[in-house]
Amino acid sequence: FIESHQLQKLDHELTETSVIQHLMIKDIDVILSVVKSSVKKISANGVPVVNGTPDIMNARIEFDNGCVANLTASRISLNPMHKIRIFQRNSYINVNFEENEAHIFQMASGAEKGKGKMTLKLSEGKEKEVFYIKPELSESNGIREEILSFKESIENNIDND
């Protein structure tokens, strides 16, 4: 399953924009690119706190392949946060967009050796080998890149279907 939290401080200029359009749509794009399955069902709830449109929103997306994504977006948070966590068999991925970092925990199959390997002590004397990976992420500004791409497509008459 996938869990997404996009929490931002109140910005009076953005209260007229839907919290879905402003915050949640980016995470929906990321999740759809990762899951690669058709959407089976969507359930959502929102609460207007500041004005007539929802300021806090929660959506649950169920996919045909059994994956479930739970997304929360808020524009009235005291502590900004933007994280996506992916839980799957034998691995856990945590991407922190605010800090521009990612953490991956992956169960070792036994044959791997190398940096980042840890042993977890479990109950009844059992142990599990786990790899911890912290990939290097490039500094990027997605909105700036989208605007530059849009500008380039106009200037060069490029059709980006």
Predicted ranges, named:
Residues 25-107, 140-158:
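Contiguous beta-strand/loop segments that form the cofactor/metal-binding neighborhood of enzyme cores
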Residues 1, 156-161:
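Short, intrinsically disordered, charge-balanced linker/junction segments flanking boundaries
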Residues 95, 101-126:
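Mobile, glycine-enriched helix-loop/loop "lid" segments at the mouths of ligand-binding/catalytic clefts
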